[in-house]
Structure formats: C-alpha cells, structure tokens
C-alpha cells in the first residue's frame, strides 16, 4: 500500500519561515558586532604577519601601538611616493602599515607590493587622526603620536625611505609578465643595425603641466634645448646608446626630438590611465633622462644608473618652492641641467 504523504500545513510553514528569518538576523547581527572595531586579538594577529611588525621593538615587547595608513591620491608616481613613505614611517615609528583599497588597485597590478589592505568598510569605523606630511623628511616624523594615524599630503622624497632602498626596490619589483614584456621590446631594438648595449629611458612630462607650470607655479616644462643637451651628454659618455622615449605628449616629442642619428625610439603609448607599459620600459633601461614629475623620479630611482633631470625650472619667487625642495626630490648623485626660464621673463 502506498504511503500517504502528510500535507505541509500553512501554520507550520509560517513557523519555519519565522525561525529561518530570526536565525539569519541574529547571525548577521553577530557578524556586525564582530566587525564594529578592530579588537586587540585581531590586530595582534595582523601584526604577526605585517612586513613592518617583525622588525620593530613594539612587537618584541608585545605592545600594541595602533596603525598607520595614508591617503591614496594622484597618479602612479604619487601613489608610489605615498606607499614608500608609509612603509618607511611605519617602520620608523614601530607601527603597522595598511594601505587603502584604491592604492592597492593602483599598484598591485604592476608591482609585488606586500603591505596589507585596509578595506573601506573597516577604515570608516576607525577614529583616524589626520597627520599632514610635507614633501621632505623632518625630525618630528620620527616620533608621530596617535594610535590610528592617517597621513595626508603628497610625499615623494627619497629623504623618507632611501635608508630602506633595498626593501623599497623589492616592494616595487615588477610582476614577471610586466617586466618580460618590457625586456622583449628592448631586446628587439637596433641602432643603425646593431643591438645596443646601453639603454637610456627618456620620460617627457607634458599634459596638464604645460599650462599649470607657467600659470600656477611660475615654472616651465622641458623644452627642445634641454632634451638635446641631455641626449648629447649620454652620447658622449656611452658608445651607441639607444634612447627609449615615453611621454604623455608623444606628438610634441616626435616634433622636437632629433632622430637623425637613428638612436631614438618612440616607445610609450602615452596613456596616463594605464601607465604600466611606459613605466616598465623606463625601469628596465640602464639610465634615465627625466624632465619633471614623480613618474620620472620613480622611474629613475628604480632603474638606477645615471640620471639627468631638469633643474631650476621655476622662478625664485615661485610658490611651488614652498611645497617642493629640489634637494629632497633628486638624489645627490643625479645630474641637473638648468631650465631655460626666458619664456617666463617675457610676461
């Protein structure tokens, strides 16, 4: 005889739905409570895995001193400066360092960065103390007070992190596929039929700087004369170099850089929104010619070798000099070629 099925009663269905909804709400409430604050146990667990933690006296004494983070603003060069500054100041002050999601999204596709990410939902629950940084290291930055400190500003100076250069270079190691694509391009270059042994990356910053420098900062961008001098210095120093030009103003470069010697290649795509290709090409060269801007500064810093940069590119009364110190931006061993300021003096 076939077994009779007991019909599913309507009141029982309501009861089961009530139990399911109630348990779900309780579960979600418990999760929300758990996420309200960063507990000491959670921070200690993160501390054990943080790159900065293992090297501080704070961890050795089992003291929990809070965390540092930094604003994530600007394009690639700015983001790199902010990351490296956070890395160095956290180490210096015995704190944990966390980067915002937006910084991770900007840097992680290109570099093998290691600092942990502070997700936006968690960051919003932390009572941050904003701490403004100038664009150069100061003694007071060695003793920064506060448990939860968020740095603001546009720090990008070797004075913050140069003492950690090997570690900074490791943080900004290119992913294999990014590096290999750049190296494959360089291997295919020829100078008058021969494979060059010396590669000089050239970064020409234009874009908004063409208007911002003279109108806002009483300054100039690199002109044709500067680039001719810079290229000639490398030609005099090295045998048959090849110059790999990248820029966000490639049309201007093609019109103003002399290619008659057959040793200049216009290689970059000049797209500011996807700078990985241009940056990788520059870092894989032996030497660097830069103009102005943090993109070129970081390319030169990672490439090593000889660097020539545009010097004295503002008038002495420029407001830019209140927020920018050339000696803190360019390494002492780099070589500066003074800019031609005559266009500014005509106005």
Curated annotation (Swiss-Prot):
It comes from the Eukaryota. One of its GO terms (biological process) is oligosaccharide biosynthetic process. GO terms for molecular function: alpha-(1,2)-fucosyltransferase activity; fucosyltransferase activity; galactoside 2-alpha-L-fucosyltransferase activity. Its main location: Golgi. Glycans are attached at residues 192, 258, 286, 312. The keyword Transmembrane helix applies. The keyword Lipid metabolism applies. Its EC number is 2.4.1.69, 2.4.1.344. Expressed in stomach, colon, ovary and uterus, specifically in luminal uterine epithelium. Expressed in various tissues including heart, liver, kidney, testis, epididymis, small intestine,and cecum. Expressed in duodenum, jejunum and ileum. The chain crosses the membrane at residues 6-26. It is found in: Golgi apparatus, Golgi stack membrane. It catalyses: a beta-D-galactosyl-(1->3)-N-acetyl-beta-D-glucosaminyl derivative + GDP-beta-L-fucose = an alpha-L-Fuc-(1->2)-beta-D-Gal-(1->3)-beta-D-GlcNAc derivative + GDP + H(+); a beta-D-galactosyl-(1->4)-N-acetyl-beta-D-glucosaminyl derivative + GDP-beta-L-fucose = an alpha-L-Fuc-(1->2)-beta-D-Gal-(1->4)-beta-D-GlcNAc derivative + GDP + H(+); a neolactoside nLc4Cer + GDP-beta-L-fucose = a neolactoside IV(2)-alpha-Fuc-nLc4Cer + GDP + H(+); a neolactoside nLc4Cer(d18:1(4E)) + GDP-beta-L-fucose = a neolactoside IV(2)-alpha-Fuc-nLc4Cer(d18:1(4E)) + GDP + H(+). Residues 1-5 are cytoplasmic. Disruption phenotype: Homozygous knockout mice for FUT2 are fertiles and develop normally and exhibit no gross phenotypic abnormalities. Induction: Induced after microbes administration in the intestinal epithelia, particularly in the duodenal and jejunal epithelia. Down-regulated by androgen in the caput epididymis. It is a single-pass type II membrane protein. Pathway: Protein modification; protein glycosylation. Belongs to the glycosyltransferase 11 family. Catalyzes the transfer of L-fucose, from a guanosine diphosphate-beta-L-fucose, to the terminal galactose on both O- and N-linked glycans chains of cell surface glycoproteins and glycolipids and the resulting epitope regulates several processes such as cell-cell interaction including host-microbe interaction, cell surface expression and cell proliferation. Preferentially fucosylates gangliosides GA1 and GM1 in the antrum, cecum and colon and in the female reproductive organs. In mouse, there are three genes (Fut1, Fut2 and Sec1) which encode galactoside 2-L-fucosyltransferase. This is Galactoside alpha-(1,2)-fucosyltransferase 2. It comes from Mus musculus. The gene is Fut2.
């Amino acid at each position: 005889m076939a077994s009779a099925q007991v019909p599913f009663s309507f009141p029982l269905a309501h009861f089961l739905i009530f139990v399911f909804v109630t348990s779900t709400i309780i579960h979600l409430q418990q999760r929300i409570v758990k996420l309200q604050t960063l507990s000491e146990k959670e921070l200690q667990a993160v501390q054990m895995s943080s790159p900065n933690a293992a090297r501080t006296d704070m961890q050795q004494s089992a003291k929990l001193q809070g965390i540092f983070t930094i604003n994530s603003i600007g394009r690639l060069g700015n983001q790199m400066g902010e990351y490296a500054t956070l890395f160095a100041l956290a180490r210096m002050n015995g704190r944990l360092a966390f980067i915002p999601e937006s910084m991770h999204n900007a840097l992680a596709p290109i570099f093998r960065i290691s600092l942990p990410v502070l997700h936006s939902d968690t960051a919003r629950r932390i009572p941050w103390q904003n701490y403004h940084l100038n664009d150069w290291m100061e003694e007071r930055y060695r003793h920064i007070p506060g448990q939860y400190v968020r740095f603001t500003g546009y720090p990008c100076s070797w004075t913050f992190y140069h003492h950690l250069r090997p570690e900074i270079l490791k943080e900004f190691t290119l992913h294999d596929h990014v590096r290999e694509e750049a190296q494959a391009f360089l291997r295919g270059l020829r100078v008058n039929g021969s494979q060059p042994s010396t590669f000089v990356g050239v970064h020409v910053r234009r874009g908004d700087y063409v208007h911002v420098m003279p109108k806002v900062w009483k300054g100039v961008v690199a002109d044709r004369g500067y680039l001719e001098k810079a290229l000639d210095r490398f030609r005099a120093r090295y045998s048959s170099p090849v110059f790999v030009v990248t820029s966000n103003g490639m049309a201007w470069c093609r019109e103003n850089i002399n290619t008659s010697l057959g040793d200049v290649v216009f290689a970059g795509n000049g797209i500011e929104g996807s700078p990985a290709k241009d940056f990788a090409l520059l870092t894989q060269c032996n030497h660097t010619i830069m103009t102005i801007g943090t993109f070129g500064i970081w390319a030169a810093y990672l490439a090593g070798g000889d660097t020539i940069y545009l010097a004295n590119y503002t008038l002495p009364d420029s407001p830019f000099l209140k927020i920018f110190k050339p000696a803190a931006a360019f390494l002492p061993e780099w070589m500066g070629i003074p800019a031609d300021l005559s266009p500014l003096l005509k106005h």
